[in-house]
Amino acid sequence: MKRIVFIRGFVFTLLFSLVCLGANCAQLGWSNDLRSLFAGNKSVIYALNIRSFGAEDTNGDDIIEPLDGDKKGTFLNAIPGLKELTKLGINTVYLLPVTKTGKLKALGTAGSLYALDSFDRLSPLLDDKDNPMSVEQEAKMFVDEAHKLGLRVIVDIPSCGSYDMSLEQPDLFIKDKNGNTVVPADWTDVRLFKVYDENGKLNRALVENYQKMIKMLQDIGVDGIRADVAAIKPYEFWKEVIDYARMKDPQFIFIAEACPTWTNPAKQWGDYETVPRLLEAGFDGYYGDWANFSDFTKSKDVIKRIKSDLKISKEFNKQKSTMASFATHDQQSVIVRGGVPLWEMITWLNVTLPLNPYFLDGYVTGDSYIYRYENKKADRSSTDDDYYFVHRGKFDIFNFSRRPEGNYAELKEKFVKAMKFKYWAKSVLVDGKFVEFKTSNPSVFAYARKNGDDAVVVIGNLNKEHEVDANVYIRNLKDTSFISPVKMGEAPIVKRGKMSVSLKPYEVQVYMLNKVNF
């Protein structure tokens, strides 16, 4: 047994600048390729809220109030931030909903982004009032500028209508036995759409309105959509909507906010479509089951989810894939849940797992999403809610908030390093097969991505409180095997067929192996 001699920095001496790394360089004439990119796990997705992405908080109180000299986020002032995303290795921008939002029974002073109030109007709150263009023209300019940088653009479409819409278009909504529209789960600001009419047939008005929304988004040039709570609408509904979209753009992507293990938030009002049926309807992908990752304690919790997603992908001839969901706007900040160690682990899982990485605005610098105005009474409001409603530690989708940014500037360098490695090792991390390794400690997971004689090995400790020791069993590993550290704390001890590691709480280690056979 001996301690391997490592050549530190070997991998990164071979890396190149991040210029045009995540996105293709500017193209003459845009050609959407997002479905192909996503199926091959080659998209790197960055989610942002136009309301906040270009906002300027001049007095540092976290809330954006123009009367106090602040600037609200708009499509136009979001454009300058796009170039920075390409430097981070991003190639796909995911916009949280940009449609008009309701003002009645609202949550927050701007209203939830998901309280849909119009199928064919963008939110006037995202318009630059100092510019003569319409908000639709400004949105198209944003998309065009993204495309010039090689960035694809997808838009989130809500699953339910606002209370305002339920008053204006009652025939679109389910009614209970008392004739009242239905609140799904505890989403008190929205009402549940009626998918089937009284004869058990698809509600044509709803289908046509969703098609109208797709047309509006295609008219401004976007490359696809993410469907919120997609499973509360059935196969036949989505089949019609997706077929409609693909007549104009065969590469127009549909990503379902759905997961094989999730349950119906409105089960008494309808069935919940399965992920395979959504994929059969034409969806290109869904959410991996990572929302509760910080609650995982056993290696099997990680491995079984990877295998489940790979099984579904295989059933669809590898033409469908998943989007990472470790840190979306629905979860508390990674920093709140587990600090920098959890942030590092989730970053490297995004980089090395067979899925499409996803990062929320503010993630790169470790935003806690804790706002100074949290649930305080507001002096002014654009809705009937006069409180700054937010979920503690979660990305604000209810108010005019500051641009997300954390207090961990040093994390940006770590993020860029991880993304550089992802692109440098893409032949392994994109094209390589997934290999599970057994470990001697149930809280330690280990796997490899292998292509030919090269492999990337990832080892992580799910114990959030204690340092642990573990053996990782790697068939045919030799004392003389060439191992280069990508991310490492204490060097492992290597003997035939085994790596012995010591891992701090939530520590992840990453190695590049050459000339391996396992």
Give short role names for the model-derived ranges.
Residues 10-21:
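Bacterial N-terminal signal peptides
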Residues 26-152, 160, 506, 514:
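N-terminal structural segment of carbohydrate-active enzymes
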Residues 28, 143, 212-215, 228-322, ...:
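Active-site-proximal helices and loops of the catalytic beta/alpha 8
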Residues 51-75, 115-136, 190-207, 222-232, ...:
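The substrate-binding groove and active-site-proximal loops of carbohydrate-active enzymes
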Residues 101-120, 159-187, 267-282, 372-386:
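Aromatic- and acidic-residue-enriched segments that line the glycan-binding/catalytic groove
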Residues 163-222, 230-231:
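Active-site-adjacent "subsite" loops/lids of carbohydrate-active enzymes
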Residues 459-464:
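Asparagine-centered strand-capping/turn motif at beta-strand->loop junctions
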Residues 494-518:
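C-terminal beta-strand-rich structural cap/linker in extracellular carbohydrate-active enzymes
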